């Protein structure tokens, strides 16, 4: 009887020790998770603060009259974030660039009939093997998307297309708020969207194209469409002058038969795109800036949109 009692006591002690070990392990695991979660929260906060370094750099660069905003790579990057400032925020690495959004074609310009032919030529030059009727359909559908609703139009082929999607949806009937809306337009598949993405943008107002920063693909679509010889001549002139000035516009639009309203040599809209990396997390940062100049030449910059990890 005594041996049975000792065995029961031993089993009870082992059971209690097991419970204590399980509880201690659970508490230790919970503590580790809390510490890790706190560390991630603190690092997220530091990442957010580090992005402000890039935003101040971008705004300061845009208001500085000595800053040379010249295209560095195809796509409109006009200024690269200095490597000397990449470690400015402790324990963070920052990189990025400032992009000229008026180096791209603004889809919201399509409300103006004059830009519809420019967009068609951009599509034609980009998708050389595509049927012209398919490209014209995209121009028509995109114009329909960004234009105000017309009750007299009724249900047409475009409306039928949107109704048949799963799930069905309606066009915006207003300027695009994000370039991702273009993927929803009738006739635009993933390949077309991704191919055009570096050349297009959706800005809140109608914007002319900057001759100083636009890519050859965009320049070739201007006016009635530049020939290869005209495009080469224009690019050579741009390289010789480094940057076109306002006084050069009249000569350029006359020689290359480009409507003056379609082009400019100074942009208003820019994109600051950057990446901030910490020990365990990283963050992509996008900020659209609007620069204006008053009569005295003084420039001011305002933030239009600010997003994280997606535009």
Name each model feature, range by range:
Residues 2-4, 8-13, 17-311:
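Compositionally biased linear targeting/interaction segments
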